[in-house]
Amino acid sequence: MIRRKEDHIRFDKQIAGGPGLIHATQLLNEGEFHDKGRLFNIVRLGPGEAVGRHQHVGDMEVYHILKGQCRYDDNGTEVMLQAGDTAVCPDGEWHAVHNDGPGDMEMVCLILFK
């Protein structure tokens, strides 16, 4: 199966009370995960935009930074991430990501079930 760029579902949404919107491109659609996960997206955050702090229960989330930099809340500890870095939020833990940089930040987001 090939999904062309123009066929991807795109959406803008506020997540977990974070400021601004995420700008997402859905790489897999619902039903394509074979009960292994629920999200595989490329997400862009503009300057000042964020995914608010939230907990994962029954699943885990991976962020891989493609472009730019961000402040990442790793279960209460803040660290700076840049292009090439990967952050994993295991089941039961909390995280958030905030674009503090001057330009856009892009990341791959993957949520897999426990």
Give the residues covered by each predicted segment.
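A short, N-terminal "cap"/entry segment at the start of jelly-roll beta-barrel domains
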Residues: M1-G37
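Short, surface-exposed secondary-structure edge patches
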Residues: I42, V62, G76-M80
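A generic "binding-loop/recognition-motif" signal
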Residues: P47, G58, T77, E93-W94, ...
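Short beta-strand His + acidic residue motifs that chelate non-heme Fe in jelly-roll/DSBH
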Residues: G52-R53, Y72-D73, C89, H95-P102
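Glycine- and acidic-residue-biased ligand/ion/polar-headgroup-sensing regions
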Residues: G58-M60, H64-C70
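Short acidic-glycine-tyrosine-enriched beta hairpin
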Residues: T77-D91
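A short hydrophobic beta-strand segment most commonly corresponding to one strand
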Residues: V88, G103-K114
